[in-house]
């Protein structure tokens, strides 16, 4: 009986693939499971022509390695579930 129980536990762990699936935000309220091998979440921000009125452009996603920031970008990476939430933007004052 103990052998059967142990076998069921092992099969469950293998089938669930525990610890291998990271969840990252892909948009403001859009968490998704990352593809296998992509074990980092990233947040990339930069200014475009509308930065003064709309704020920075934000890109969220999964990556195997942290993206290298270009000179005009800010990039942060993390490795826990939902660790890259959409940045909160201050509201403009009228």
Swiss-Prot record:
- Give the GO molecular function terms: acetylcholine receptor inhibitor activity; ion channel regulator activity; toxin activity
- Keywords, alphabetical: Acetylcholine receptor inhibiting toxin, Disulfide bond, Ion channel impairing toxin, Neurotoxin, Postsynaptic neurotoxin, Secreted, Signal, Toxin
| GO cellular component, as recorded | extracellular region
**SUPFAM superfamilies registered for this protein in UniProt:** Snake toxin-like
Q: Which InterPro entries does this one have? A: Snake_3FTx (IPR003571), Snake_toxin-like_sf (IPR045860), Snake_toxin_con_site (IPR018354), Toxin_cobra-type (IPR054131)
**Recorded superkingdom:** Eukaryota
Against Pfam families, the record matches this protein to:
Toxin_cobra-type
Q: What is its main location?
A: secreted
Asked if the record carries the keyword Cell membrane, the reply is no
The record's subcellular location field reads: Secreted
User: Has keyword Transmembrane helix?
Assistant: no
* Cystine bridges: 24-41, 34-62, 47-51, 66-77, 78-83
State the signal peptide span: 1-21
Which tissues is this chain's protein expressed in? Answer: Expressed by the venom gland.
What's the stated role of this polypeptide?
A: Binds with high affinity to muscular (alpha-1/CHRNA1) and neuronal (alpha-7/CHRNA7) nicotinic acetylcholine receptor (nAChR) and inhibits acetylcholine from binding to the receptor, thereby impairing neuromuscular and neuronal transmission.
For this chain, the family text in UniProt reads: Belongs to the three-finger toxin family. Long-chain subfamily. Type II alpha-neurotoxin sub-subfamily.
Question: What is the name attached to this protein's record?
Answer: Alpha-elapitoxin-Nss2a
Query: Which organism encodes this protein?
Result: Notechis scutatus scutatus
């Amino acid at each position: 009986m103990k052998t059967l129980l142990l076998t069921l536990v092992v099969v469950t762990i293998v089938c669930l693939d525990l610890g291998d699936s990271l969840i990252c935000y892909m948009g403001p309220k859009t968490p998704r499971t990352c593809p296998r091998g992509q074990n980092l979440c990233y947040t990339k921000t930069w200014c475009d022509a509308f930065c003064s009125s709309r704020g920075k452009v934000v890109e969220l996603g999964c990556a195997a390695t942290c993206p290298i920031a270009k000179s005009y970008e800010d990039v942060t990476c993390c490795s826990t579930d939902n660790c890259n939430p959409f940045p909160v933007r201050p509201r403009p004052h009228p």
